[in-house]
Structures are given as C-alpha cells and as structure tokens.
C-alpha cells in the first residue's frame, strides 16, 4: 500500500483478538504491578439541576465501612478552571459554589471496594439554595433568565457573529421568492452510551503519574491532568488500553478522570474509578441538542433559491466541545447535497442546566442534514409537490471534478440524482403499504 489509504483496501487488524480472547479494558488491568493495592473512587453527585451550595455534609459517608477518605472541593483546595472555549465560564472540578446540572460531581469517596464507595456516596448530603433551572435553549435565552455563569453576562456563550460571520438578514433575504416556507425543529439530545462506560486508574511512581483512561484522545487529556496535579506534562504518562466505544464523547478529559491523580497523592495509594451505567447517562457528555429555525424559498416550479438556518446549540451546563465544534460543522454542511445559490447560516450556543454536550458522531453535520432535509419537505408541502421531485430539481448535478458549494464545502465526486432514482426503484413496490420519505446524507 502506498502513502495514502485513499482508494486502498484497508484490513482491520484488531478483530481476531476481540473475536477470540477478547480485549483488555481499563477494568481488566488486574495484573498491573503499579496498581497493586489500588483503592476505589466513587463520586457523589448533585441531585438538583441548579442551585447555590450552602453546605456539604460528608460525615456519615466518612464513617461507613471501608471508606478511607472523603473529599470536597474545599478539602482538595480546588481552584476554578476556565473553559477552553469561553474563559469567562469557570468551574471547580468538584462543584464548590453552585451546581449546574443533575449528576455534577460534588464529592469524592475513596474506599476499599467499589460497592462500599457507592453506598457511602448515597449518604453525602448537600444543602442547596435552589435556583431556576433551564432545560432548553429558548427558556435559557428568555429575558430575565437567571445566569448559569454570572461572569458570562448571558446564557448565550457563543455566536458565529463574533467571528465576523454575518447575521441572518431575516425576511429581506427572501424578497423575490415566489414561495416561502418556515419551520422550527428540534434535533433531540442523545446520550452516547458506549458499551464500556468511562473508567480510569492512576498510580504515582517515583514522582511520575501513570494514568490509564478509556479515551479516544490521550493527547487531549495530558494538559488538564498535568495542570491539575501541578506537574510538567513530561511527568505524566497517559495509557489507553482497548476502548469499548466512545463515539466522540470520550474525547478529552472529564473532571472525574482529571481528579484521580490529585486524590491519589492525598491518600498515597493507586486508585481506580469506573462509573455506573446510570452515571454514564447523566455525566458522560451528550450529543446533538439543536433547535433549528429554518426558512426556505424559491419558485413555484420547485426550484429552491434561498435557504436560511439559525441553529441554537444547547451546550448543556459547561462550555465544552459541543458549544463550538457542533455549530462550526453545521454551517459548512448546511447546503447538504443541494445546489442552493443563496444560503445564510448562523449558530448560537446557549448554556442550560443539562448534561454538557460534546462531539458526537458527526458533530454538527448530521444536524445540518436533518435541517435542510426537513426544509425540503416543508417546501414540497407548501407547493403540493412530491418531495422526491423537489429534491431531484435541486440536487447538485452529476460532477466528476470537485464541486464547491456556496458555503465553501468541496465535494470530490457525486451523482446524487442517480442515487435518488435507484432508491425510488426499490421503494415503488412498497408505496401501497407504507409511507415513503426521503433524505440524503453526504
């Protein structure tokens, strides 16, 4: 094989192991000498979506069987850490002043067994001054909404206009269109749910931190872990065993992983942590979560000439990768596979009192496709025209040389009309028994 994998047959090398003896994941590191005598960490989590923390009582947890230590942010001396994507948003790795979503970690329990830690976590009691909670972007943006991050001055934490990209021009954009259709869609929030939940293990050896993580991006975990432990990155070694799925949600490092080295240095023992499936549902980053305001216009014979999308990205309760990456990728894919000559696309990211969103399977591109495909259906409905025929009239014509869309995305090859024709051939026999709809994903 040459220097590129493009056009080459690439054989998977990992399958024989997984199909025979099986993989070796973080939880399988039972014979690792550095982890001999490791204790287990469990995190107590917030039970309210938004509130000021008045006090955290860990006394009962500390007295339970098998519990070695219990730590809050104050016990560990944790300082606020700014978001990489908006430095005005800060948080401590264990919530200290307020909680912002159900499942946010507020205390860490170190125990002899995992089960002892889970029992102890149930007894940690936090007293909250409960604040209004927002679970959707529209309520979080409403006038007078309580700020989730006071220093940000707004629950809107990112907008493509700050990059110099133009605002949408509203109804003026559609002057001259014979037909205009509008819609508001929700691209529903999803939980990634990899077969292997998050897990990590740490050991300090001769002043150097060795950390095993179930991650898709070991390099991205290095800086935050080194920073939290106050050491040079050269003193941290990140090891990634087999990873049982991630889908984008295991990119980077989470507070539960970053804290392990800090806690290990306090107790003087290696540590293991693995979340439960229930924890994974509320604390592993979520995906999608866009509200999409679409307007589409064109001629009465079915030609789309103008398309406008304003995507409101739900960032969840932290300004993370989902705040920037998903909307960034929505814009260049907003045209889908259609030759629409005029497109406006703006994205606005909003924090809410929900699990933070991250990069998940396409990160913004499937959302863009869903929006334009729904818009095509709206346009067809407004015209009273067959939805497949509207698509056929607007597909990018067959091309052999690279084609660049009006939003700057270059497609190297394509014959989308042929694909549509073939799909119609396969579905024609089902028409009498089933409703048929179409969508094109590139």
What does each model-identified segment do?
Residues 24, 48-50, 75-77, 106, ...:
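Short, glycine-/Ser/Thr-/acidic-enriched flexible segments
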Residues 71-104, 138-150, 220, 238-259, ...:
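Short, surface-exposed loop/turn segments at secondary-structure boundaries that line and modulate
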Residues 73, 235-241, 268-278, 305-310, ...:
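Beta-strand segments within the central parallel beta-sheet cores of soluble alpha/beta enzyme folds
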Residues 8, 13-20, 155-200, 289-375:
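Glycine-rich loop/linker segments at domain edges
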Residues 43-71, 108-128, 200-267, 324-333, ...:
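Alpha-helical support elements that line or immediately flank enzyme active sites
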Residues 1-155, 183:
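Flexible, low-hydrophobicity surface segments
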Residues 99, 202, 263, 296-297:
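A structural signal for short hydrophobic beta-strand segments in well-ordered beta-sheet cores
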Residues 425-442:
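Single conserved hydrophobic/aromatic residue that forms the stacking wall/gate
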